[in-house]
């Protein structure tokens, strides 16, 4: 199977405007108590308001605040934010992250993976016609742009870990900015999520798209759990053994001969 063989499958078609609110509200499950304790949940109204107001919304928040798991759900469940014939896609720079996040969110919502929440990585598509939220690698979305230049099947594209600045993400941001500035994606909302406070740089990059009335980046303070940095020396101390560095002598090393 080619990586670009499968499309992002939207919902079951267009519905009348008067039915959109009812359909979304009835279909959205109650968020779990664990999700409601996340710092992101406390800022949910600000987050949704920012996405409604802006074409491109920039969100920053500490690692562990719930950006990757909760914001895609909030967007998917919000009333009249994403049309029922379109999906919400959240990109991840790595395949493992796309899979584990999709599994966690599906389990948190009490659903089977591939039903309302799914994922798409190279050669593997785990979603159905009922899927509303798809976690996908950034490379997959780039391939989608090649076959679907205006991303008509996507209502909101969330680009996570944008601060990592890998080549796929940078290229995707460039293509999106040019397409939206030229009016080729009038239906699309874009959300950029960063774990650093340099969100203003990304907001400035998309100023041409958002215009002068754009809201400032949304910052989510706080994290659920403390994050500590550990290094190689710490691991050596824990296990009571430190492998000899390559090139420092020993059987397999390239140290100087005596």
What residue ranges belong to the model's regions?
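P-loop NTPase motor module signature
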Residues: 1-258
């Amino acid at each position: 199977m080619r990586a670009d063989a499968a499309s992002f499958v939207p919902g079951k078609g267009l519905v009348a405007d008067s039915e959109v609110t009812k359909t979304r509200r009835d279909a959205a499950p109650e968020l779990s108590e664990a999700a409601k304790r996340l710092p992101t949940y406390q800022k949910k109204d600000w987050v949704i308001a920012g996405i409604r107001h802006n074409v491109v919304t920039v969100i920053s928040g500490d690692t562990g605040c719930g950006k990757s798991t909760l914001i895609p759900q909030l967007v998917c469940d919000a009333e009249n934010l994403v049309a029922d014939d379109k999906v919400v896609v959240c990109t991840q720079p790595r395949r493992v992250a796309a899979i584990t996040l999709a599994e966690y969110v599906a389990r948190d919502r009490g659903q089977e993976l591939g039903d309302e929440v799914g994922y798409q990585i190279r050669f593997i598509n785990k979603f159905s016609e009922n899927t509303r939220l798809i976690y996908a690698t950034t490379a997959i979305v780039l391939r989608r742009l090649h076959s679907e230049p205006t991303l008509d099947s996507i209502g909101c594209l969330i680009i996570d870990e944008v601060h990592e600045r890998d080549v796929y993400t940078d290229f995707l941001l460039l293509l999106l900015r040019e397409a939206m500035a030229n009016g080729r994606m009038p239906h699309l909302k874009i959300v950029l999520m960063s774990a650093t406070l340099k969100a203003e740089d990304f907001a400035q990059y998309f100023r041409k798209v958002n215009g002068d009335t754009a809201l400032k980046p949304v910052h989510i303070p706080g994290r659920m759990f403390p994050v500590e940095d550990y290094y190689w020396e710490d691991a050596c101390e824990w296990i009571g053994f430190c492998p000899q560095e390559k090139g420092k002598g020993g059987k397999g090393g390239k140290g100087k001969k005596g």
